[in-house]
């Protein structure tokens, strides 16, 4: 009778495992890279584009707004309204595409100032905007100015303002258009959107939608 140790001693040694040739490793890596590029760079974007176009055609196309057959803007991108007869949006810190100077609501160069809350430039800019907002809307020094009226969004392209900011502009818009303030306020409230999911954000109005409605009065 043989013992286990004897069997181990009499067994032939296992052959040494041969390393995978380098060309084969490179070929495997290349094939994996090509596969992931096709899946992640072609198949997945095409699939999401087709699904989004079928399920959400308006949003997938940019949420474009038309008037008399002409595209006048997008519901999700703000515009730089400055005339007294229009509702004004938030400040925008976007610049020209070549960086040569400011260009509010430039969708080709979205971004913010990147100034921190303690930065003297930001504090000075906000104080200047508060004074300008009060002056253009005929507000007294004791009237609180909503924060969204004097601060830019992270994208510089925010299409909405809070209801409070919109209502503070009613008298200026009404005077410029020869309307009653109640009529302007009615248009603004007709475009009021509530908080997202009933919890997030503030009640807001879309600036472009309000201005188009005002032009249609």
UniProtKB/Swiss-Prot annotation:
Region described as Disordered: 87-117
Pfam families with a match to the protein in the record: KdpC
Chief subcellular location: membrane
Origin: domain of life: Bacteria
Membrane topology value: Single-pass membrane protein
Compartments reported by the entry: Cell membrane
Gene Ontology cellular component annotations, sorted alphabetically: plasma membrane
Keyword Lyase among UniProt keywords: no
Keywords: ATP-binding, Cell membrane, Ion transport, Membrane, Nucleotide-binding, Plasmid, Potassium, Potassium transport, Transmembrane, Transmembrane helix, Transport
One MF annotation (Gene Ontology) recorded for this entry: P-type potassium transmembrane transporter activity
UniProt cross-references to InterPro entries, sorted A to Z: KdpC
Parts of the chain that traverse the membrane: 25-45
Sequence ranges of Polar residues compositional bias: 107-117
Signal peptide: none
GO terms, biological process: potassium ion transmembrane transport
UniProt subunit comment: The system is composed of three essential subunits: KdpA, KdpB and KdpC.
Family named by the database record: Belongs to the KdpC family.
Role according to the record: Part of the high-affinity ATP-driven potassium transport (or Kdp) system, which catalyzes the hydrolysis of ATP coupled with the electrogenic transport of potassium into the cytoplasm. This subunit acts as a catalytic chaperone that increases the ATP-binding affinity of the ATP-hydrolyzing subunit KdpB by the formation of a transient KdpB/KdpC/ATP ternary complex.
The name this protein goes by in its record: Potassium-transporting ATPase KdpC subunit
Organism per entry: Deinococcus radiodurans (strain ATCC 13939 / DSM 20539 / JCM 16871 / CCUG 27074 / LMG 4051 / NBRC 15346 / NCIMB 9279 / VKM B-1422 / R1)
Gene (UniProt): kdpC
């Amino acid at each position: 009778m043989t013992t286990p140790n004897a069997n181990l001693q009499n067994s032939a040694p296992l052959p040494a495992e041969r390393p995978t040739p380098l060309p084969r490793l490179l070929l495997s890596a290349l094939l994996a890279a090509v596969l992931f590029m096709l899946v992640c760079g072609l198949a997945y974007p095409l699939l999401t584009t087709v699904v989004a176009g079928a399920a959400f055609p308006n949003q997938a196309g940019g949420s474009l707004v038309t008037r008399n057959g002409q595209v006048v803007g997008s519901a999700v991108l703000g515009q730089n309204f400055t005339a007294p007869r229009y509702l004004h949006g938030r400040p925008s810190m976007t610049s020209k595409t070549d960086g040569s100077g400011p260009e509010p609501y430039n969708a080709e160069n979205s971004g913010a100032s990147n100034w921190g809350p303690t930065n003297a430039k930001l504090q000075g800019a906000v104080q200047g905007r508060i004074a300008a907002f009060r002056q253009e809307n005929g507000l007294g020094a004791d009237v609180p100015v909503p924060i969204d009226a004097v601060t830019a969004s992270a994208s510089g392209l925010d299409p909405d303002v809070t209801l409070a900011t919109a209502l503070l502009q009613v008298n200026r818009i009404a005077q410029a258009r020869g309307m009653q303030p109640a009529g302007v306020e009615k248009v603004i409230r007709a475009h009021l959107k509530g908080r997202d999911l009933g919890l997030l954000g503030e009640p807001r109005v879309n600036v472009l939608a309000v201005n188009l409605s005002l032009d249609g009065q």
